Regions:
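Short cysteine-rich clusters marking metal-coordination/redox-active sites
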Residues: 8-12, 35-38
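Basic, short loop/linker segments at the boundary and entry of helix-turn-helix/winged-helix-like folds
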Residues: 20-66, 112
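RNase H-like nuclease fold core
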Residues: 34, 84-85, 90-180
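DNA-recognition alpha helix
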Residues: 72-84
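Acidic/histidine-rich, metal-coordinating catalytic segments
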Residues: 174-193
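RNase H-like polynucleotidyl transferase catalytic core
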Residues: 204-225
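Charged alpha-helix within mobile-element recombinases
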Residues: 223-269
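C-terminal domain-tail junction helix/linker
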Residues: 251-323
Length: 323
């Protein structure tokens, strides 16, 4: 995990941190720390730094909105059940902020591909124009890959498959070297898929192009319903977002929806999440969405400085700024 300057304490030591009271704001109190070496105070960035509402409130609003509630319904729920007054703009900003942060982390994870990968694009209406959401799904684990929201172009098709290649290409090469059965991609008759796969996955994966709905009549054991059945949930989510005009916000909502489905939603009580089925085992706790945000940041300043000390601290050299 990389550490930005905005999260850096004032020194790299591990013995110069002390508790220094509490920081109070609207959401309550938060532990404040002091660097005894430079006599400066700070609070750790746990993913909700300088936010006026509690982490549980923010995550509950995001979960409600992603499960199909409108902005107004989410706002009314928080007021009726928790006596918390929040504007619709705040909820919208939370979704955009944490969608981008979580996606930047989950894009670095590589799910194990155990069966076919089905690709398709679902038609949406944004700002009165036809728009398409490109996505893919693994048939056995149910893990989803989210592509761009845009036109039906070759570039958007390549963007989706570039993400799949980044996460799964090493598995394809390993299967080829060991002589195992290749991963198979399944998609409809859109020529963009065949052209893209011939460039990106040549000789390392098989394709089934132009899969029909009546697959058994064509001698096939499967069709593309694995991904097409997911389009209903996407259409229902967009239908709640009336008169939406911001394509970037639509993309954030749909990407965050797929991330929550991958890491926080079980198919039933006894089954695993798609990410766990794909070999990505993260200790997210009971509130998995909140746990996913905490994974992006350091929960405790001592843990942060210790990890920083182990990775970046060089005993023999001295910083020029503080020499």
């Amino acid at each position: 995990m990389s550490y930005g300057k905005d999260k850096m304490p004032f020194c790299k030591g591990v013995d110069c941190i002390a508790r220094n009271g509490w920081r109070y704001n609207k959401k309550g109190k938060k532990q404040r720390w002091k660097c005894t070496k430079f006599n400066k105070r700070f609070t750790e960035d746990d993913g909700f730094w300088k936010m006026k509402n509690a982490p549980e409130t923010i995550v509950e609003a995001i979960d409600l909105y992603e499960t199909g509630h409108s902005l107004e319904q989410t706002k009314e729920h928080l007021w009726n059940h928790h006596s918390i007054r929040i504007s619709e703009t705040s909820i919208r900003n939370w979704v955009k902020k944490y969608s981008r942060k979580i996606e930047a982390y989950t894009d670095t994870l590589s799910p194990e591909v155990k069966a076919r990968i089905h690709e398709d694009e679902v038609e949406l209406e944004v700002n009165g124009k036809k728009t398409y959401f490109w996505r893919a799904k693994e048939s056995k684990t149910g893990f989803k890959f989210s592509g761009p929201v845009g036109r039906r172009t070759m570039e958007n098709c390549q963007s989706l498959n570039r993400q799949i290649k980044q996460k799964c290409y090493s598995q394809m090469l390993d299967r080829k070297k060991k002589g195992k059965k290749k991963i198979r991609f399944v998609f409809d008759k859109l020529p963009h898929y065949k052209t893209t796969h011939s460039k990106m996955f040549r000789n390392v994966a098989d394709i089934t192009h132009g899969i029909p709905i009546k697959a058994k009549q064509k001698g096939l054991k499967y069709n593309n319903n694995v991904i097409e059945c997911e389009h209903t949930a996407v259409n229902e989510r967009i239908r709640r977002m009336r008169h939406v005009e911001d394509i970037d916000f639509v993309e954030c909502v749909l990407h965050l929806k797929d991330i929550i489905d991958n890491f926080a939603r079980r198919r039933n009580r006894k089954s695993k999440t798609p990410a766990e089925s794909a070999g990505i085992n993260l200790d997210l706790g009971r509130n998995k969405t909140l746990g996913l945000i905490y994974l992006l940041f350091i929960r405790c300043p001592e843990d942060f400085i210790l990890s920083l000390h182990q990775k970046h601290y060089k005993p023999k050299t001295t910083s020029k700024k503080y020499a």
